[in-house]
Regions:
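Short-chain dehydrogenase/reductase
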Residues: 16, 77, 95, 101, ...
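Flexible, glycine/small-residue-enriched loop-and-beta-strand segment within the central core
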Residues: 1-88, 115-116, 123-124
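C-terminal end-helix/capping segment
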Residues: 106, 111-127
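Short conserved catalytic/interaction loops centered on acidic-Pro-aromatic/His motifs
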Residues: 51-53, 91, 107-109
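Beta-rich strand-turn-strand
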Residues: 79-95, 100-104
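Residues that flank catalytic or metal-binding motifs in active/ligand-binding sites
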Residues: 42, 98, 108
């Protein structure tokens, strides 16, 4: 597991973080917060910052970075090799399919997959 800016990362109780996970928090608002009972497969990446690119007249490398928080609520399962990008909230009980790139919020109890990740279906409700 690799932690960039570890003071910006909070992991809840009873989480299972598999090997090769990368947590890249930002320096200002790019916190990464995992709730309780979160399960990640191997090779998951959390990236709470990115290059700024708003001005065409300035090379991207010279424009700096922006960051935004990532929030993973309780009881979420994140599949192998998924990438969670800055500014995303993953709702309680959601499942993120293997290899997905999550660039938008995920509703509670949604099952998402793909690049970019889209809702495939909702988890069944209790009887």
């Amino acid at each position: 597991v690799m932690l960039r800016q570890p003071t910006m990362i909070k992991i809840g109780d009873h989480c299972s973080i598999n090997h090769n996970n990368i947590f890249q928090a930002g320096r200002q608002t790019g916190t990464i917060t995992l709730g309780n009972h979160v399960l990640t497969a191997a090779n998951v990446m959390f990236v709470a910052y990115s290059h700024a690119y708003d001005t065409r007249e300035i090379p991207i490398i010279d424009q700096g970075y922006y960051d935004a928080p990532i929030v993973v609520e309780d009881d979420v399962w994140i599949g192998f090799g998924a990438i969670i990008l800055a500014g995303v909230t993953i709702g309680r009980g959601a499942i993120i399919g293997a290899g997905s790139v999550v660039n938008k919020d995920v509703p509670p109890y949604a099952i998402v997959g793909g690049v970019p990740a889209k809702v495939l279906k909702m988890r069944a409700t209790d009887l």
